[in-house]
Amino acid sequence: MIVNGIGALNLKPGLGDTATDLIQGGVAPATSGNLGTSFAEAVSQAASKTVNTLQNAEQVSLQALKGDADTRQVVDAVMSAQQALQTAVAIRDKVVSAYLEVSRMGI
């Protein structure tokens, strides 16, 4: 199963008016040579980014304990990690919910 990413839209630069861009042909369909990443790859990349964000927050916190980072850097890193973790949990909940819904379907 192939899921085309946002890059498959081939957006042309415009003045920022989406309706005008659409009317003038600013959005082109994906071509056969421009296949997006698979769903598994997209989920894997998102998980990797989340883990990297959490590790960065941990490193910045340790640097602050050593006196190498200020409070603002720690707060920014921890808030970013919290947001990434909340997003990952929300996605997990949606996937589990979808799985349960599909499993209840009759064949």
UniProtKB/Swiss-Prot annotation:
InterPro entries: FliE (IPR001624)
GO CC list: bacterial-type flagellum basal body
Pfam families named among the record's database cross-references: FliE
Entry keyword set: Bacterial flagellum
Subcellular location, record wording: Bacterial flagellum basal body
GO biological process: bacterial-type flagellum-dependent cell motility
One function term, GO molecular function aspect: cytoskeletal motor activity
Main location group: other
Family: Belongs to the FliE family.
Protein name per the record: Flagellar hook-basal body complex protein FliE
